[in-house]
Amino acid sequence: TEQPEPVVLDVRTEEEFESGYIPNAINIDLRMGPGFIEQINTLDKNKPYYVYCRSGARSAQAVQLMRDLGFNETYNLLGGILEWEGEVIE
């Protein structure tokens, strides 16, 4: 079987996202609380997710939450966008 396409998930605020993001990232703000969980639950649980924020703290929380919700393949991009050496869309 083919590997599902990984999803890049940015859990920062919309303002932070608009100031620069990793290509193809989708933005769901962790700080929305219940709204975050609601939106996360609409995603495909079978896909791998690469989760990032500014420095890695919020994404670590998001990864834990997603695992609790049944997402099996979630990865925290350590160091966040600050440490990201790839392309950033501004």
Task: Spell out what each predicted region is.
Residues E2-P6, E15-P48, R54-E90:
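Rhodanese-like catalytic fold shared by cysteine-dependent sulfurtransferases
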Residues V8-D10:
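Structural scaffold elements adjacent to functional motifs in cytosolic proteins
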